[in-house]
Every structure is written in C-alpha cells, then in structure tokens.
C-alpha cells in the first residue's frame, strides 16, 4: 500500500522532514503472507519463506486495476456512455488477444502487439467499467490477466479488534492460551502473555499447550532451568496414554533447554523423540547433528544432518554444519561441492564461505567474504556461535580471531565470546587475560541480546577477575528479556566492582523505580550517575523526568537545568522540557524566545508538544497584553497561534481544535470595540464536540477545549448551553476520578 501524510500543513511539514528536497513524500509498504502492516507471522525453526516482489515503473494508466510482471491494466469511464481500456507492457508482447465481455457476451475483441514504448488505449462504446469484464490471453491461449468490477452489494462491516480481557475474566484455558499467543505474536507493550498462560495453569496445571508456551517463553528469556519444569509437565500429560504422542514440539523445546544447560545426553534423547514427528525432523535432526559433532561422533553427525536436509533442503545453517562435518571426516571434495551448491542457493551463507576459507589453507580471510560480512561484529558473532552450538570451539575461536584482526573497532562482546570459547577449551588463564582486555576496552554502543551471549557472560563473570563491564552487559540482556531481578543483581555486582560507572547507576535507577518501587534509592542513583558524567544529556533528561515523577516543583527542576544550559541545547526533548518549565513558572517571554530560536525535529512520543508550548507562551503573553490594554500586540500574539512556523518541525492537523485561541481573539476584538468580529470569533470558539473523552493521543480533543466552548457560549448569550459544557466536564471527572487506566 502507499502511505502519505497528505498535502495539508501537517503533510507538508513531514515532506520537509523526510525528503531531501522538501518535496512530496510517499511511503511504500509491501508485505507477504500478511493482510496488513502489523500482521506478524510465525517462523518455525530454520524455516524459509520465499517470495518475489515486482516494483514496476509505468505511465499514463491512471489507477491500475490489475497487474502482473508483464502487463498493467486500467479501465475507467471516458464519458457517461463509454469506457476506455489502457494497457502497459513491461516487455514486448506479441499476439495478445484482448476480450471485453458484458456478462457472457463478447462485445469487443482484438489481437495486438504491445511494447513498453506506447500505452495501448481503446474506447469501448456503450459500456461502463462496472459492466465490463476484461480478459487478456497470450498467443498460445494462456490467460495472462483478467478483471471485473467487484459487486456493489453492501457487505457487513468487520467488528473492530477487542482488547484482551483480564486473565481472570477469560472463560476457558484454551482462550487463555490463544490470548497469550496473540500477545506474544504482536509483542504487546503493556499486556504480558505469561499472565494468561499462568492463569490457565492455575486452573489446570497439566495443560499441554500452556505448559509448552510457558516453557518456550522462559527459554527465549534465558531461564533454562525454569523452562525445563514446564516442558516436562507438558510431556508428562502428552504421554499419559501414548508414548509416541501426536505433537513433538514439547520434546524439541525440552531438547533446547537441556542443551543450553549442557545436559547433552538428555537433550539428545529429547531431540530424537521429537524426530518421531515429521514436523520436527528437520530441526530435530539438525540439533542431533550438532550434539553428535560436539562429541566428535562424525559419522552419526553426518547421518543426522543428512536426515535434516532431506526434510529442509534450504536450511543454510544445516548446509554449513554438513560442510564442517565433511571437513572433519576428511571428505574435502564433497565439502567443496556442497559449499558451491549452497552458495548458488544463498550467496550470503557466511558459514559455507568460512568453511571454504578454512579448507583453502590461506592465511588471510578472502576479501570477498569480508565485504559480504561488512566487517560487522554481529555477523562474526553469529558465525562463531554457529560453530559453538556444534561444540566446535576451535573454529568458533578462529572466527572471533578473524574478526578481531579484520575489524577496526570490534565489539567488546567479541572478546567475551573469545573468553567463553577459551574456557570451554580448558584454557582458563588465557580466558582471564582476554576478559581483562575486554574490561579495559572502550564501552561501545552495542547491546548483546542472544541466548549465547547470556552463556558467554555468565561464564566470564564466574572467572576470578574484576569484570564490571561483563556484569553490566549481562544486566542489559536480562532487562531486555524482562528478567528484572536478574538484571538488578547483575548491575549491583557491577556497581560493587566499579562505583564510578555512570551507566550502571543509571540502569539501576530505572530498574529500582520502575520495577522494584525503590523511588528514593532511584533518585540517589541517578543523581550520582549524573555527577559522574555531567556531559550526558540523556541522563540529565532522565533525572529531570524522575524529579517530575517524584513531584518536584517546577522551580526545583529549573534549579537543576539552569546549571546545564549548554547540555540542554543538545537534545530537543530536554530543551522543550526546559521551555515548558519556564512557561509553568511564568517566564513566558523567555520560553517564547527559546522556542522561536530553535529548529525542532519531531520524535516519537513528542508529537504536538512543541506547538503546545509555542502556543501556551503566546496565549499567556496575550492575556497580559489584553489586561494592560495593549490590544494590537495581544491580537498579533493570538494570530500567531493559528500558524505553525517551519522551525517547530510539525504542521497543523486538519480539524485542529482552536477553541481557546478563538475565545481569546474574541475577547481582544471585543475590548477593541470590534463587536461583530468578536461575535464571529466567539461563535467559532463555541463549536466542536462537547462530550469529554480520554485524551490519549496528541490529536485527541483536550478537555480544556470544551471549557472554552462554554466560555464562548456564555459570551454569545447561550448560558444554558455553556452550563451544559461545564457540567459535562464535572460529570466526566466525577465518573472517572478513581478509574485505573489500562492501555
């Protein structure tokens, strides 16, 4: 689909923000296996979905009714009686047969050649596009393209999406499972899928699907031991009546959590059991091959990876694993043939390319592989952990060493991976040296998020060495995985080792406030973090927001910000907060000057905030001028509220509510003696929706707009309607005063 912000003031502001030439902006959105933009889908382990999308330039057609990669077609009304057919070919098309039907009757037929040089047009007499059916055949008679108008019958409007019920109100364990699954799929920001799974298990702790879902969720969060308990419960129920159950997924998931705990014998059994079911054979046998390779059982590993590839020929990691196994078996020729075949399927198979390099015996990594991997640390980490998953620590180490050689600024995490690999190779002293190197490296802006990173960091934090950075990164992963207590524990260890690490103090502050309810401690930590680095504008912004949450007065907050004006100027959000505080403390002139001298850039969550402060300062100054009898100045200030200058970074939305501006404009005009104009302004100010609603988004009507409607109605003599507006606000407030807001 195509998305545009429109051509109004709001849309033109986005044109300026999003295009180099400040011209029109159209956003193309495309998708496959999906009905709409947020319709996320599932991928099974090592699954590949294949699709082709064509982006085709065309001209002169108007609105395309149907298209293929070869032809584009439009049919539209030429006048009240006739229709015009337009065709555009992307390549030469000879002997096309074009048929126009009305119901079953052919009313026009033609055979023609098309080329991209000219658009084919033909007028069909005495028919409307709604009546016409278009069929286009190639010279051999194959139907290339067809179209007919959709039925004009009124279809029922689909029901809008409904919010999930609280877990306790969901009737069945099945619906609890489906709701949790939906929340996982759409990654809902405020609802927690585990609340639904756990409620289902509270009602029936043997439920297969909810136990499996909880186990899989915990596995993805790095909680392998906890996940194992749920998965074993699922399997116990699954095998009560049949030792070879219908579904193999819980066995496969159990194999994963056991493997990540180094319980390789039990993991092997679980994966083999999963392979009883066809749906899990490709991923199950692949995992078995990894385990066999880790134990140097190369013949078994080859058999298992072959079984996996039979079920999933395009498992590119499986192909890499097979190439490695063949190399270990000394079957280099077969390995090279497999690598060539694999690269014909996917030229970006880093694993196969790395295997080719290992087999070549060359000292330096080929430049072609470096170019494809872009000297990107993350690519090397992924490749190294592929080897690690197969217990091939030597080659995993070789990948990391290649990265450290080739990348000018490798991620610190590469060093921690190297230390992990060395530990697994029983080279602890060397691992300690590498961790020391990592701890003394600059902290990069890189945040690991993989399960292997958890294992690596857990390993290095157990070494006999001072490792505050490793604990810091481990805390980051745990927080990302929503394992908040583990995150706090890791950060507290980091803090104990290095109390001068501002980012750790900042992270702990957020966790204390948001997750543990330790508000005073959160303030102390964030203040300490900022004292350690008073150049960090983000921490200053967050400290001010924390003061705001703790109900510090605007003057107290200004006292902090006034000390750091240079830093404030580096962030739009902090700069705007400073201007807002000036407005709140009556420094309207200064606030207006600050806003007027800056070019703002929109940010998500900040929509509407800059114009709001721009307008608020002017309204307050206009009120002062009105009171002082400076009517012309007051009117000029109010008129500026109706226009969004470009430096605000935003445009005015169509239908923006301006009741307050119109009301004050009327008051000024009234004071100037322009009663007719004043009455007109009051009348406009009195219009709009008079029913209060929750103002959640920046373009929702704010309740004060209704208040100004009431004031304006009073000005035009409609006292009863004015009181109605005021009473509606009071009633809404009383009704919702004690509501618990859930988003």
Which residues make up each language-model segment?
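A contiguous, surface-exposed recognition patch within enzymatic or periplasmic domains that forms
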Residues: 1-48, 56
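Long, contiguous interaction/recruitment modules in multidomain scaffold/adaptor proteins
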Residues: 64-171, 344, 348-354, 358-368, ...
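Start-of-helix register in tetratricopeptide repeats
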Residues: 174-175, 209, 249, 283, ...
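Residue-level recognition of tetratricopeptide repeat
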Residues: 181-182, 216, 256, 290, ...
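Single-residue signature of alpha-solenoid repeat helices
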Residues: 193, 227, 267, 301, ...
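Hydrophobic/aromatic packing residues within the alpha-helices of TPR/SEL1-like helical repeat arrays
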Residues: 197, 231, 271, 305, ...
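Short coil turns that delineate tetratricopeptide repeat
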Residues: 205, 239, 245, 279, ...
